[in-house]
């Protein structure tokens, strides 16, 4: 019998280390020597080993000092209840070719068909948002907050679930202020976030197999937050934390394997559009002059888009029979290549630049495919289609401008399509090539202009949302959503255009004699007369207003964003990052005990109902101490008159169902300077501007007596009274808010102003500069 085999089995090799309880020798007991000074010997004995002598320093006896700090204690409410808010949400959902968008802004969109979401997100969490998720059946509360008007916040545990194929990078911020700036979205780009030491990688199961399928992160309370009891109404809108997340590609960080180059190509408008870019009606005459110059330049017609836009107009019989050219064949150049004659054309937008072309119809040797009769077709087609659009739409459509029409206007695909019969004979555009790994960011500028602006130069007042000195691949990340939040225009993708200035492109998007000059890029689909995504179904209203906007420039930003390092290349139709959260709260208060009396004669069953017991959750916005009964309100079996009067002021709930919030609540707010806020509010409330500029302790009549006297003469007495009434009402609202804040400070219920939402602190209330 091989019983000894078990003893002979080789043990697993381990690194040798000394056990803490074993010593090579032990301290030896010896006679204590006389010492002078402030040290004395200490004799200790250990088990086993040799003896060894040990010493310790003599502790100097000093005078007793007072305590540097004291502990301030707060009385807790009589009733306390722990509550965990547990739920599941998608941190981000990224559809195909939506990498550069912000999912937090598009989370509540209902567009279909088409991709949804974005490749990055800036989510915030508040108690109101958690209650809103509860109303959407996205989380559950382990305890009810009914009649408990106080609360404490203890932190949150987050669990991020790894995707099978796509990697993610997240960053959790608990440092106020929780506001977006022009640098927030570029810093969330995977190429930038990969360099952040506080970022956490969420690798896919494919990139890092064999590990847990989730990553747990423990997050405490926000910085500068004092842990004490607060009314739920005060913590309702306080931002607890923000989550920045983005999709990334760890397997192919420097370009997709489905492409043969990392260079990005797009087109920009030529300089002929510089002074004719506005869409205002008073600039129509200038646009007509430019359109005439473009239509007279016959080499621009050397493209297949000429057939797509103008041939249906001829085939439909829109040309009068008396004209000699009634068929499409009459507009084609029939001159053979053997002819050595040439024709000189003046390039549009200039008076001195000329281009010499052969008269033959061979476009590969700089010939023209069409003859001079085609010059009038674009204007005739644009005029007819523009009038037809106005007739169909009726009073809802007031624009009748053939220069902006889809088929033959200034931005028709005949002039802007990159597909030419010969690649060296371009249209009214310039091909731009961009290598993301040569971009240092120095001198780059990215901004938007309203469609009414009359030039392409950057202006500090008219231009908005400037991002400078950053690589284009980072500046393009989440840019459109930042512009929408910064300007407050949710339809900005149809009301503004994008301009770029960069010395790191080929050719350079830079004019050395005019440093503020920008260039208008557009996507390949817009140049071909298609919608974003490649659809040929252009709406009839958009065909009458066909010009480059952010809606048609989004694909350029998408290509720039995907060219950066570690960027997700949108290889899957839809990806999502799931998260589970567990927010820890404590509800407290002094509620009136509610005694439930049941019918003793009714038959009851020992077993409970099959339906899970539901909790009564109250909106934290209305769960305030003023609207809650407390134990001190109940005297001798009755409620006091003050308590009844206070409860009668509670607002009643209505059954009107709204269409939803204009912007998702989880989306973070944007930072506005005090100067921008004053400019916006001065447009909405002109009388309030006088209240903020002139302090109440100064005499404004002496300083502005001359300017105000002329205004008072023109205004009637009723108008002056209305303005004064409006000023008094606004001032009254601010004073009431001021007294409310002072009362909270006296009650030790104040919150750090940096944690409050925008407009909730005294500095923003009275425009005090930080």
UniProtKB/Swiss-Prot annotation:
One of the GO BP terms on file: DNA replication
Region described as Disordered: spans on this chain: 647-682, 697-717
Annotated Gene Ontology cellular component terms: T=1 icosahedral viral capsid
Chief subcellular location: virion
Keyword terms of this UniProt record: Capsid protein, DNA replication, T=1 icosahedral capsid protein, Virion
Composition bias, Polar residues: 647-656
Sequence ranges of Low complexity compositional bias: 703-717
Localization terms from the record: Virion
InterPro entries hit by this protein: TTvirus_Unk
Biased composition annotated in UniProt, kind: Basic and acidic residues: 666-681
Similarity comment text for this entry: Belongs to the anelloviridae capsid protein family.
Function: May self assemble to form an icosahedral capsid. Presumably essential to initiate and monitor viral genome replication by a rolling circle mechanism.
Name listed for the protein in its UniProt record: Probable capsid and replication-associated protein
Organism: Torque teno virus (strain VT416)
């Amino acid at each position: 019998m091989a019983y000894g085999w078990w003893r002979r089995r080789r043990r697993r090799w381990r690194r040798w280390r000394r056990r803490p309880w074993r010593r090579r020798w032990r301290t030896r007991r010896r006679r204590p020597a006389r010492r002078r000074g402030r040290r004395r010997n200490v004799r200790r004995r250990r088990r086993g080993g040799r003896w060894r002598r040990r010493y310790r320093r003599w502790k100097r006896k000093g005078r007793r000092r007072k305590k540097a700090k004291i502990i301030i204690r707060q009385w807790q409410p009589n009733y306390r209840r722990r509550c965990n808010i547990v739920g599941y949400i998608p941190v981000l959902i990224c559809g195909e070719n939506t990498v550069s968008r912000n999912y937090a802004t598009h989370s509540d969109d209902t567009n279909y068909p088409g991709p949804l979401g974005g490749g990055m997100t800036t989510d915030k969490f508040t108690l109101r948002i958690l209650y809103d998720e509860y109303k959407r059946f996205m989380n559950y509360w382990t305890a009810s907050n009914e009649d408990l008007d106080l609360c404490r916040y203890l932190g949150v545990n987050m669990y991020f679930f790894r995707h099978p194929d796509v990697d993610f990078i997240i960053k959790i911020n608990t440092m106020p202020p929780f506001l977006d700036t022009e640098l927030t979205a570029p810093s969330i780009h995977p190429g930038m976030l990969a360099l952040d030491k506080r970022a956490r990688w969420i690798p896919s199961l494919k990139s890092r197999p064999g590990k847990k399928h989730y990553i747990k992160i423990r997050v405490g309370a926000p910085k500068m937050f004092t842990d004490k009891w607060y009314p739920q109404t005060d913590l309702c809108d306080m931002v607890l934390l923000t989550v920045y997340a983005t999709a990334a590609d760890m397997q192919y960080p420097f370009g997709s394997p489905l492409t043969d180059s990392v260079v990005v190509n797009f087109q920009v408008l030529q300089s002929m559009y510089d002074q004719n870019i506005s869409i205002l009606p008073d600039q129509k005459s200038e646009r007509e002059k430019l359109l005439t110059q473009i239509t007279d330049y016959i080499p621009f017609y050397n493209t297949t888009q000429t057939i797509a836009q103008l041939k249906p107009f001829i085939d439909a019989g829109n040309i009068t029979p008396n004209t000699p050219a009634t068929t499409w064949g009459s507009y084609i150049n029939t001159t053979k290549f053997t002819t050595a004659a040439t024709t000189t054309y003046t390039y549009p937008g200039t008076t001195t630049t000329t281009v010499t072309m052969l008269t033959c119809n061979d476009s590969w040797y700089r010939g023209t495919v069409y003859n001079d009769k085609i010059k009038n077709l674009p204007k005739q087609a644009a005029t007819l289609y523009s009038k037809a659009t106005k007739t169909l739409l009726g009073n809802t459509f007031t624009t009748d401008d053939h220069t902006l029409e889809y088929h033959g206007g200034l931005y028709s695909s005949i002039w802007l399509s990159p597909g030419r019969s010969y690649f060296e004979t371009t249209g009214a555009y310039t091909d731009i090539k961009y290598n993301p790994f040569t971009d240092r960011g120095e001198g780059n500028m990215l901004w938007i202009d309203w469609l009414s602006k009359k030039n392409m130069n950057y202006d500090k007042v008219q231009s908005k949302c400037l991002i400078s000195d950053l690589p284009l691949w980072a500046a393009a990340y989440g840019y459109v959503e930042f512009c929408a939040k910064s300007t407050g225009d949710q339809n900005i993708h149809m009301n503004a255009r994008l301009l770029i200035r960069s010395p790191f492109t080929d050719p350079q998007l830079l004019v050395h004699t005019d440093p503020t000059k920008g260039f208008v890029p557009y996507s390949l689909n817009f140049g071909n007369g298609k919608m974003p995504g490649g659809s040929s179904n252009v709406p009839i209203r958009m065909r009458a207003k066909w010009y480059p906007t952010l809606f048609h420039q989004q694909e350029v930003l998408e290509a720039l964003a995907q060219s950066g390092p570690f960027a997700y290349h949108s290889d899957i139709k839809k990806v999502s990052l799931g998260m589970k959260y567990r927010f820890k709260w404590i509800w407290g208060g002094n509620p009136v005990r509610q005694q439930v009396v049941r019918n003793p004669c009714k038959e009851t069953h020992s077993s409970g109902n099959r339906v899970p017991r539901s909790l009564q959750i109250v909106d934290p916005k209305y769960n305030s101490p003023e609207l809650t009964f407390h134990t001190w309100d109940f005297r001798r079996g009755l409620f006091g008159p003050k308590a009844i009067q206070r409860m009668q002021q509670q607002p009643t709930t209505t059954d009107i169902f709204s269409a939803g919030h204009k912007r998702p609540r989880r989306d973070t707010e944007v930072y506005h300077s005090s100067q921008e806020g004053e400019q916006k509010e001065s447009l909405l409330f002109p009388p309030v501007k006088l209240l903020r500029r002139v302090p109440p302790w100064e005499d404004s009549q002496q300083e502005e007596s001359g300017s105000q006297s002329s205004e008072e003469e023109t205004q009637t007495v009723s108008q002056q009274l209305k303005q004064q009434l409006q000023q008094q009402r606004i001032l009254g609202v601010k004073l009431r808010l001021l007294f409310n804040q002072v009362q909270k400070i006296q009650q030790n219920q104040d919150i750090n102003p940096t944690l409050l939402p925008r407009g909730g602190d005294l500095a923003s209330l009275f425009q005090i500069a930080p």
